[in-house]
Protein backbone atom coordinates (compact mmCIF):
# COMPACT_ATOMS: atom_id res chain seq x y z
CA UNK A 1 0.00 0.00 0.00
CA UNK A 2 1.22 3.51 -0.79
CA UNK A 3 2.06 5.74 2.16
CA UNK A 4 2.96 9.42 2.14
CA UNK A 5 5.59 11.02 4.39
CA UNK A 6 5.80 14.43 6.03
CA UNK A 7 8.64 15.35 3.65
CA UNK A 8 6.52 14.46 0.58
CA UNK A 9 3.75 16.70 1.88
CA UNK A 10 6.05 19.62 2.69
CA UNK A 11 7.61 19.47 -0.78
CA UNK A 12 4.16 19.51 -2.39
CA UNK A 13 2.96 22.45 -0.26
CA UNK A 14 0.16 20.46 1.39
CA UNK A 15 0.54 22.61 4.54
CA UNK A 16 -0.46 25.91 2.90
CA UNK A 17 -4.10 26.70 3.65
CA UNK A 18 -6.17 29.70 2.59
CA UNK A 19 -5.94 33.30 3.78
CA UNK A 20 -6.95 33.53 7.43
CA UNK A 21 -10.00 35.72 6.68
CA UNK A 22 -11.57 32.92 4.61
CA UNK A 23 -11.23 30.22 7.25
CA UNK A 24 -13.93 27.88 8.49
CA UNK A 25 -13.72 27.67 12.32
CA UNK A 26 -14.59 23.95 12.14
CA UNK A 27 -11.09 23.40 10.71
CA UNK A 28 -9.43 24.88 13.81
CA UNK A 29 -8.31 21.46 15.19
CA UNK A 30 -6.26 20.88 12.02
CA UNK A 31 -4.56 24.30 11.85
CA UNK A 32 -1.03 24.75 13.18
CA UNK A 33 -1.02 28.55 13.02
CA UNK A 34 -0.78 31.42 10.53
CA UNK A 35 2.08 32.90 8.53
CA UNK A 36 1.69 36.12 6.50
CA UNK A 37 -2.09 35.95 6.98
CA UNK A 38 -2.22 32.42 5.51
CA UNK A 39 -3.24 29.46 7.66
CA UNK A 40 -0.71 26.65 8.00
CA UNK A 41 -2.17 23.14 8.22
CA UNK A 42 -0.78 20.83 10.88
CA UNK A 43 0.85 18.03 8.87
CA UNK A 44 1.38 16.00 12.03
CA UNK A 45 -2.35 15.39 11.75
CA UNK A 46 -2.59 15.21 7.97
CA UNK A 47 0.05 12.48 7.54
CA UNK A 48 -1.67 9.84 9.75
CA UNK A 49 -5.16 10.86 8.57
CA UNK A 50 -4.17 10.47 4.91
CA UNK A 51 -2.42 7.16 5.52
CA UNK A 52 -5.49 5.85 7.43
CA UNK A 53 -7.65 6.92 4.47
CA UNK A 54 -5.31 5.08 2.07
CA UNK A 55 -5.53 1.91 4.20
CA UNK A 56 -9.34 2.06 4.08
CA UNK A 57 -9.40 2.69 0.31
CA UNK A 58 -7.05 -0.27 -0.12
CA UNK A 59 -9.55 -2.46 1.76
CA UNK A 60 -12.46 -1.23 -0.36
CA UNK A 61 -10.51 -1.89 -3.59
CA UNK A 62 -9.48 -5.37 -2.43
CA UNK A 63 -13.19 -6.21 -1.98
CA UNK A 64 -13.90 -5.19 -5.61
CA UNK A 65 -15.35 -1.88 -4.41
CA UNK A 66 -15.94 0.92 -6.90
CA UNK A 67 -14.28 4.24 -6.12
CA UNK A 68 -15.54 7.46 -7.68
CA UNK A 69 -12.94 10.24 -7.97
CA UNK A 70 -14.52 13.71 -7.90
CA UNK A 71 -12.69 16.92 -8.82
CA UNK A 72 -14.41 19.36 -11.14
CA UNK A 73 -12.34 22.51 -10.70
CA UNK A 74 -9.76 23.38 -13.33
CA UNK A 75 -6.69 22.63 -11.18
CA UNK A 76 -7.88 19.06 -10.50
CA UNK A 77 -9.89 18.10 -13.60
CA UNK A 78 -7.26 16.44 -15.82
CA UNK A 79 -5.34 14.86 -12.93
CA UNK A 80 -8.56 13.31 -11.54
CA UNK A 81 -9.32 11.70 -14.90
CA UNK A 82 -5.78 10.34 -15.27
CA UNK A 83 -5.68 8.96 -11.72
CA UNK A 84 -9.05 7.21 -12.01
CA UNK A 85 -8.16 5.71 -15.40
CA UNK A 86 -4.78 4.52 -14.11
CA UNK A 87 -6.47 2.30 -11.50
CA UNK A 88 -9.57 1.30 -13.55
CA UNK A 89 -11.94 3.39 -11.45
CA UNK A 90 -14.48 6.11 -12.18
CA UNK A 91 -14.52 9.90 -12.20
CA UNK A 92 -16.49 13.11 -12.50
CA UNK A 93 -14.14 15.90 -13.57
CA UNK A 94 -16.34 18.55 -15.19
CA UNK A 95 -19.65 19.61 -13.69
CA UNK A 96 -21.35 17.57 -10.99
CA UNK A 97 -24.93 17.15 -12.21
CA UNK A 98 -27.39 17.34 -9.32
CA UNK A 99 -28.81 13.85 -8.68
CA UNK A 100 -25.83 12.03 -10.15
CA UNK A 101 -26.01 9.62 -7.21
CA UNK A 102 -29.43 10.23 -5.66
CA UNK A 103 -31.22 10.03 -9.01
CA UNK A 104 -29.18 7.17 -10.46
CA UNK A 105 -32.18 5.79 -12.38
CA UNK A 106 -32.32 8.89 -14.60
CA UNK A 107 -28.52 9.03 -14.91
CA UNK A 108 -28.58 5.41 -16.12
CA UNK A 109 -30.93 6.42 -18.97
CA UNK A 110 -28.53 9.19 -20.00
CA UNK A 111 -25.64 6.70 -19.93
CA UNK A 112 -27.66 4.38 -22.20
CA UNK A 113 -28.18 7.29 -24.61
CA UNK A 114 -24.44 8.04 -24.51
CA UNK A 115 -23.59 4.42 -25.36
CA UNK A 116 -26.17 4.36 -28.17
CA UNK A 117 -24.65 7.50 -29.69
CA UNK A 118 -21.15 6.04 -29.36
CA UNK A 119 -22.28 2.97 -31.30
CA UNK A 120 -23.94 5.13 -33.96
CA UNK A 121 -20.78 7.22 -34.37
CA UNK A 122 -18.76 4.05 -34.98
CA UNK A 123 -21.11 1.90 -37.07
CA UNK A 124 -21.67 4.42 -39.88
CA UNK A 125 -25.11 5.65 -38.73
CA UNK A 126 -23.89 9.27 -38.50
CA UNK A 127 -22.71 9.13 -42.12
CA UNK A 128 -26.23 8.29 -43.33
CA UNK A 129 -27.73 11.35 -41.62
CA UNK A 130 -28.06 14.87 -42.94
CA UNK A 131 -25.15 17.14 -42.05
CA UNK A 132 -27.31 19.06 -39.59
CA UNK A 133 -28.62 15.93 -37.83
CA UNK A 134 -25.12 14.40 -37.67
CA UNK A 135 -23.77 17.62 -36.16
CA UNK A 136 -26.55 17.72 -33.56
CA UNK A 137 -25.88 14.14 -32.52
CA UNK A 138 -22.12 14.73 -32.39
CA UNK A 139 -22.71 17.70 -30.09
CA UNK A 140 -25.03 15.64 -27.89
CA UNK A 141 -22.44 12.85 -27.76
CA UNK A 142 -19.67 15.28 -26.76
CA UNK A 143 -21.85 16.82 -24.07
CA UNK A 144 -22.81 13.45 -22.58
CA UNK A 145 -19.22 12.17 -22.78
CA UNK A 146 -18.05 15.28 -20.94
CA UNK A 147 -20.46 14.86 -18.06
CA UNK A 148 -20.92 11.07 -17.89
CA UNK A 149 -17.92 9.54 -19.69
CA UNK A 150 -16.12 8.84 -16.42
CA UNK A 151 -19.03 6.86 -14.93
CA UNK A 152 -20.53 5.20 -18.02
CA UNK A 153 -19.08 1.78 -17.07
CA UNK A 154 -19.65 2.07 -13.31
CA UNK A 155 -22.76 -0.12 -13.52
CA UNK A 156 -24.32 1.17 -10.29
CA UNK A 157 -23.56 3.37 -7.31
CA UNK A 158 -19.95 3.62 -6.09
CA UNK A 159 -18.72 2.18 -2.77
CA UNK A 160 -16.71 5.32 -1.91
CA UNK A 161 -16.02 8.87 -3.09
CA UNK A 162 -12.55 10.41 -3.15
CA UNK A 163 -13.01 14.17 -3.40
CA UNK A 164 -10.59 17.00 -4.14
CA UNK A 165 -11.95 20.15 -2.42
CA UNK A 166 -14.83 19.42 -0.04
CA UNK A 167 -16.14 22.99 -0.37
CA UNK A 168 -16.34 22.95 -4.16
CA UNK A 169 -17.92 19.48 -4.28
CA UNK A 170 -20.42 19.88 -1.42
CA UNK A 171 -23.35 18.71 -3.60
CA UNK A 172 -21.59 15.40 -4.36
CA UNK A 173 -20.78 14.96 -0.66
CA UNK A 174 -24.41 15.64 0.37
CA UNK A 175 -25.66 13.05 -2.12
CA UNK A 176 -23.17 10.45 -0.86
CA UNK A 177 -24.22 11.21 2.75
CA UNK A 178 -27.89 10.68 1.86
CA UNK A 179 -27.04 7.25 0.44
CA UNK A 180 -24.58 6.20 3.15
CA UNK A 181 -21.61 6.12 0.74
CA UNK A 182 -18.35 6.87 2.62
CA UNK A 183 -16.63 10.12 1.63
CA UNK A 184 -12.85 10.61 1.61
CA UNK A 185 -11.97 14.25 0.96
CA UNK A 186 -9.20 16.81 0.87
CA UNK A 187 -10.47 19.55 3.19
CA UNK A 188 -8.74 22.95 3.11
CA UNK A 189 -8.92 25.61 5.84
CA UNK A 190 -11.87 27.36 4.14
CA UNK A 191 -14.00 24.21 3.95
CA UNK A 192 -16.68 22.64 6.13
CA UNK A 193 -15.53 19.14 7.17
CA UNK A 194 -19.07 18.04 8.11
CA UNK A 195 -20.24 15.14 5.97
CA UNK A 196 -16.71 13.93 5.26
CA UNK A 197 -16.09 10.50 6.81
CA UNK A 198 -12.33 10.53 6.21
CA UNK A 199 -11.05 14.10 6.55
CA UNK A 200 -7.67 14.81 4.94
CA UNK A 201 -6.72 18.39 5.92
CA UNK A 202 -4.64 19.85 3.12
CA UNK A 203 -4.07 22.34 0.32
CA UNK A 204 -6.70 21.71 -2.36
CA UNK A 205 -5.45 24.26 -4.93
CA UNK A 206 -1.77 23.57 -5.64
CA UNK A 207 -1.27 21.21 -8.58
CA UNK A 208 1.66 19.47 -6.86
CA UNK A 209 -0.43 18.75 -3.77
CA UNK A 210 -3.37 17.50 -5.87
CA UNK A 211 -1.03 15.21 -7.83
CA UNK A 212 0.45 13.86 -4.59
CA UNK A 213 -2.98 12.87 -3.24
CA UNK A 214 -4.19 11.37 -6.50
CA UNK A 215 -1.01 9.40 -7.23
CA UNK A 216 -1.05 7.88 -3.73
CA UNK A 217 -4.75 6.96 -3.94
CA UNK A 218 -4.45 5.47 -7.45
CA UNK A 219 -1.40 3.40 -6.40
CA UNK A 220 -3.22 2.16 -3.29
CA UNK A 221 -6.34 1.23 -5.25
CA UNK A 222 -4.27 -0.63 -7.87
CA UNK A 223 -2.54 -2.62 -5.12
CA UNK A 224 -5.87 -3.38 -3.46
CA UNK A 225 -7.31 -4.60 -6.76
CA UNK A 226 -4.27 -6.78 -7.49
CA UNK A 227 -4.68 -8.36 -4.01
CA UNK A 228 -8.24 -9.20 -4.97
CA UNK A 229 -7.16 -10.65 -8.35
CA UNK A 230 -4.39 -12.69 -6.68
CA UNK A 231 -6.92 -14.13 -4.20
CA UNK A 232 -9.30 -15.00 -7.04
CA UNK A 233 -6.50 -16.76 -8.91
CA UNK A 234 -5.55 -18.67 -5.74
CA UNK A 235 -9.15 -19.77 -5.20
CA UNK A 236 -9.55 -21.03 -8.76
CA UNK A 237 -6.18 -22.81 -8.45
CA UNK A 238 -7.36 -24.57 -5.26
CA UNK A 239 -10.64 -25.54 -6.95
CA UNK A 240 -8.76 -26.99 -9.91
CA UNK A 241 -6.63 -29.26 -7.72
From Swiss-Prot:
The lineage of its organism: Bacteria, Pseudomonadati, Pseudomonadota, Gammaproteobacteria, Enterobacterales. Pfam families: Ribosomal_S2. Keywords: Ribonucleoprotein, Ribosomal protein. Disulfide bonds: none annotated. GO terms for molecular function: structural constituent of ribosome. The gene is rpsB. The keyword Nucleotide-binding does not apply. Belongs to the universal ribosomal protein uS2 family. The keyword Ribosomal protein applies. This is Small ribosomal subunit protein uS2. InterPro entries: Ribosomal_uS2, Ribosomal_uS2_bac/mit/plastid, Ribosomal_uS2_CS, Ribosomal_uS2_flav_dom_sf. GO terms for cellular component: cytosolic small ribosomal subunit. It comes from the Bacteria. One of its GO terms (biological process) is translation. NCBIfam families: rpsB_bact.
